[in-house]
């Protein structure tokens, strides 16, 4: 039984390690973004504010399922007969809630909110992951946009 619990735990940790928030940074492009034409504009940073980017609730499903399975296994080791069934169900519910919480915490990443006055006079706000590049007010930046997403980089 211990081997099963250990195997399920390792599988859950392996899946959790697959979370990748690097594409939220202005320093990283996905494979589908490479070699794509992007419109470029220029601007100046007006204000910089650190923010926290929370992954979507849909991504917490893996944590909830993994936690429920692990909790069910652990609950199944308690008691016998009806007590075992109740412990299995309670363990699955508690494990699911705990697993979702752990996955939610893992999906948080440090970001930066950039208020940018574009050279055309418009002011925009962009939130992206805080990568290796540090931004500051007054800094000139280049904005690369594919129509639905924009990436801010130093000029």
From Swiss-Prot:
Covalent lipidation (N-palmitoyl cysteine) residues? 18
Question: Where is the protein localized?
Answer: Cell outer membrane
Please name one Pfam family that this protein belongs to: Rick_17kDa_Anti
Q: Give the lipid-moiety residues, type S-diacylglycerol cysteine.
A: 18
Q: Keywords in UniProt for this one? A: Cell outer membrane, Lipoprotein, Membrane, Palmitate, Signal
State where it is primarily located. membrane
Q: Which domain of life is it from?
A: Bacteria
Instruction: Write down the membrane topology.
Output: Lipid-anchor
Q: Does the keyword Transferase apply?
A: no
Instruction: Please name the InterPro entries in this protein's record.
Output: Bact_OM_lipoprot/Surf_antigen (IPR051407), Gly_zipper_2TM_dom (IPR008816)
Question: What GO cellular component is one of the record's annotations?
Answer: cell outer membrane
Query: Could you tell me which PANTHER family the record lists for this protein?
Result: OUTER MEMBRANE LIPOPROTEIN SLYB, PTHR35603
So what family is this one in?
A: Belongs to the Pcp/SlyB lipoprotein family.
Which protein, by its recorded name, is this? Outer membrane lipoprotein SlyB
Gene name, Swiss-Prot/TrEMBL: slyB
